[in-house]
Amino acid sequence: MSSISLNVLDDSVLIKPISEEKQGGIVLPSSAEKKPTKGEVIAIGEGSRNSSGERVTLTVKAGDKVFYRQWAGTEIEHNDEKLIVMKESDILAVIK
């Protein structure tokens, strides 16, 4: 796991995308490559609040490998690493 020092808020999740290995040695321009939809959870927020004001904790945790929606979240760069901040609801599955 990466040593990234960002504090993620509410029901947001910080993801480090995992690129799939390329087969066959064909190099594609970055604009033609499919966006990754698999990543590692680096950090999570404290959770959202329900109508009573109580915290609803997130299901995922740091270190989980997940599949997420292709165009989910906002891409950021921190310490020369490309990361994505998204809502937990954009995560489709946890890889066991």
Swiss-Prot record:
<keyword id="KW-0963">Cytoplasm</keyword>
<dbReference type="Pfam" id="PF00166">
    <property type="entry name" value="Cpn10"/>
</dbReference>
<comment type="subunit">
    <text>Heptamer of 7 subunits arranged in a ring. Interacts with the chaperonin GroEL.</text>
</comment>
<comment type="function">
    <text>Together with the chaperonin GroEL, plays an essential role in assisting protein folding. The GroEL-GroES system forms a nano-cage that allows encapsulation of the non-native substrate proteins and provides a physical environment optimized to promote and accelerate protein folding. GroES binds to the apical surface of the GroEL ring, thereby capping the opening of the GroEL channel.</text>
</comment>
<keyword id="KW-0143">Chaperone</keyword>
<dbReference type="GO" id="GO:0051082">
    <property type="term" value="F:unfolded protein binding"/>
</dbReference>
<dbReference type="InterPro" id="IPR011032">
    <property type="entry name" value="GroES-like_sf"/>
</dbReference>
<protein>
    <recommendedName>
        <fullName>Co-chaperonin GroES</fullName>
    </recommendedName>
</protein>
<dbReference type="GO" id="GO:0005737">
    <property type="term" value="C:cytoplasm"/>
</dbReference>
<dbReference type="GO" id="GO:0044183">
    <property type="term" value="F:protein folding chaperone"/>
</dbReference>
<comment type="similarity">
    <text>Belongs to the GroES chaperonin family.</text>
</comment>
<dbReference type="InterPro" id="IPR037124">
    <property type="entry name" value="Chaperonin_GroES_sf"/>
</dbReference>
<dbReference type="GO" id="GO:0051085">
    <property type="term" value="P:chaperone cofactor-dependent protein refolding"/>
</dbReference>
<dbReference type="InterPro" id="IPR020818">
    <property type="entry name" value="Chaperonin_GroES"/>
</dbReference>
<dbReference type="GO" id="GO:0046872">
    <property type="term" value="F:metal ion binding"/>
</dbReference>
<dbReference type="GO" id="GO:0051087">
    <property type="term" value="F:protein-folding chaperone binding"/>
</dbReference>
<dbReference type="GO" id="GO:0005524">
    <property type="term" value="F:ATP binding"/>
</dbReference>
